[in-house]
Every structure is written in structure tokens, then in C-alpha cells.
């Protein structure tokens, strides 16, 4: 039997419903506020200087800049695999690489900047990571033109300097996921997640398998590698695969568009991607549109949809600037002048 309520009762119920809904909304917004502030707090704990220095300008001037000859040799260099068949020719050392990057000087700079003991311990892990993996990054730069600074900064950020569980378990330092097979996609579409197995996921050489790690979904699988250098090689594949510039997920255009050792105006590229990225040219770096090559490359990654974080490109810039990773890029280019 349908019951009718008086106008007063209806108004009272409506009011209670309104305030209940308002309270729920406040709780959601409050939660988002706390989450965002918690993220900013965590982000601020990273061992990074959030103020850009003139060290890059000084460093570039100290080495006499990068000549047009070096740039031409580097970007037109034939680096087909057979060039590295001999052990002594497997990397940039063949051109007499001399880097000015030093762990001790970086740590001294950060100590002088007022880093706490906790941040200095974290910074020590970061410089140790850079020292251990700079050769892998330089080899990929030599072969495929992706700046070593970009590769290292991404790895530092995405694997917490190799300390994340995923990095320790799989040697996957860039969070590269395995793809769903057609069979796996059917199971996911039917929400039969408990039926998913490792063999339902696809991985690409040099990956040797997959690892179940909860990211967006509990069933996510990530690629696993024999070594960290294989992880760098796989990441470079992703950044240099043939694609159509202007499309989300296409990164290969970045490395030719923003050559090492120069400043670049990101305006034109940012406008091409603006509809997809939602970021205007002047919004990438607080109104600054002409930036060092590594900042332009970081912006290019963000333009093309590499990361969902709104400040991903800025974090990459800060990491490269804080740890002076540009010194590795310049060393390789200077080696091309000989």
C-alpha cells in the first residue's frame, strides 16, 4: 500500500537528504584535498632541489659548447648492432668519453643547499644509482639518441633509484607493463580476473617474463628482465619506436626535435599536442617556453602522454638539474668532436 506523507514530512526528508548528500560530498572533497596534500608532502621528500640553478649554463660554457660538427656526427652516426660486435666497442667508451660528473661534488652541493640528514641519505642512494647505471644510459644514448639524462631521471623517479619492489623483483626500472593477449582481454571484459594467468600476457624482448604487481588493477603484469641494462634497452625501444608524430604515445620525434646542448622553444610542439594534453605552451614551465634541451625533451614526453602526473615533466627537469645529469650528455657529444 502506497503511503503519502505530509508536505512538512516531505520537506524534512528532503532537507535531511540534502544535508546527508552535502556531508558525503564534503567528505569526498576533503579526502581528495588530503590525498593531494599528502602527495605534495611525499613529493617534497624527494632529494631534489626545487629551484633551478645556472650550473648547466656554466657547465656548457666550461666545455666550450657543443659544435655543429659534433651534433652532425652524433645524430647521423650509424649505430647498427654490428658496430658493437667487439667487446671493446660495446659503448661510448670507443670515442674516449670523459665526463665531468662526480658523486662527491653533487653530494657536497646538496649538503651546502641545506639537505637534512634524511634527504642526504636518499641523495646518496640517488647518486649511487646514477653511478651504477650511467653506462647503460650512455649506451642507449649513443645508439638511439635518447639523452642519458632523460633515461636516468625517468628511472630515478619511476623506480625510486632502483629501490621499489617492482625494480628489485624484476629489474624493471621504468614500470613497463606486459600487454593483454586476446584471451586475457576477453577475461577482463567479462570480469573473470581470477582466471588470468601469466601466460595470458605478452612481453617483448629483451623481457624474459612477467610479474604480477598491483598498479591500476590487481591483475596487472609487468615485464621482467635479466638485467637493469635490459630494462634500459626496452625503455629505449618504447621511446624510439616508429610512430606518427602528434599522436598520443608517439615519442620518437622528440630526440631529433630537441638536440642536446641547445635551448629550444617548445611552443609549436606544445600547440600540436594541446588538444590531447590539455596543456598550453606557457603552462609547462611557469610561463617559460624556451628551455634547455632536457627540459624540452621532458615536456615532449608529457605532451605525448607518457605520464598522467601533471608535473611529471617538471620533476624530470628538477632531477636532471639537481644531479647535473646533463654532464653525461655533454660528455658524449664532446667525444664526437675528436
Residue ranges and their predicted role:
Residues 2-157, 161-338:
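Catalytic cores of secreted/periplasmic lytic hydrolases that degrade extracellular macromolecules
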Amino acid at each position: 500500500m502506497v503511503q503519502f506523507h505530509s508536505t512538512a514530512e516531505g520537506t524534512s526528508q528532503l532537507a535531511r537528504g540534502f544535508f546527508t548528500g552535502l556531508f558525503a560530498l564534503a567528505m569526498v572533497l576533503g579526502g581528495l584535498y588530503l590525498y593531494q596534500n599528502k602527495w605534495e608532502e611525499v613529493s617534497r621528500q624527494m632529494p631534489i632541489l626545487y629551484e633551478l640553478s645556472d650550473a648547466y649554463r656554466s657547465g656548457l660554457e666550461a666545455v666550450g659548447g657543443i659544435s655543429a660538427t659534433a651534433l652532425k656526427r652524433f645524430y647521423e652516426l650509424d649505430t647498427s648492432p654490428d658496430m658493437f660486435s667487439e667487446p671493446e666497442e660495446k659503448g661510448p667508451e670507443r670515442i674516449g668519453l670523459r665526463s665531468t660528473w662526480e658523486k662527491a661534488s653533487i653530494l657536497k652541493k646538496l649538503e651546502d643547499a641545506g639537505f637534512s640528514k634524511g634527504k642526504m641519505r636518499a641523495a646518496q642512494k640517488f647518486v649511487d644509482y646514477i653511478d651504477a647505471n650511467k653506462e647503460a644510459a650512455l649506451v642507449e644514448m649513443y645508439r638511439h639518441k635518447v639523452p642519458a639524462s632523460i633515461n636516468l631521471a625517468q628511472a630515478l623517479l619511476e623506480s625510486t633509484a632502483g629501490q621499489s619492489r617492482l625494480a628489485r623483483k624484476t629489474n624493471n626500472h621504468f614500470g613497463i607493463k606486459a600487454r593483454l593477449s586476446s584471451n586475457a582481454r576477453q577475461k577482463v571484459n567479462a570480469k573473470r580476473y581470477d582466471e588470468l594467468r601469466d601466460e595470458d600476457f605478452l612481453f617483448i624482448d629483451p623481457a624474459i617474463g612477467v610479474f604480477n604487481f598491483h598498479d591500476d588493477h590487481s591483475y596487472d603484469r609487468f615485464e621482467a628482465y635479466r638485467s637493469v641494462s635490459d630494462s634500459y634497452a626496452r625503455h629505449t625501444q618504447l621511446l624510439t619506436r616508429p610512430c606518427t608524430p602528434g599522436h598520443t604515445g608517439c615519442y620518437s620525434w622528440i630526440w631529433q626535435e630537441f638536440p642536446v646542448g641547445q635551448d629550444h622553444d617548445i611552443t609549436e610542439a606544445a600547440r600540436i599536442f594541446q588538444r590531447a594534453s590539455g596543456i598550453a605552451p606557457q603552462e609547462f614551465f611557469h610561463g617559460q617556453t624556451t628551455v634547455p634541451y632536457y627540459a624540452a625533451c621532458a615536456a615532449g614526453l608529457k605532451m605525448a602522454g607518457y605520464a598522467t602526473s601533471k608535473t611529471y615533466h617538471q620533476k624530470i627537469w628538477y632531477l636532471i638539474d639537481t644531479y647535473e645529469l646533463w654532464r653525461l650528455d655533454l660528455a658524449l657529444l664532446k667525444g664526437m668532436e675528436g
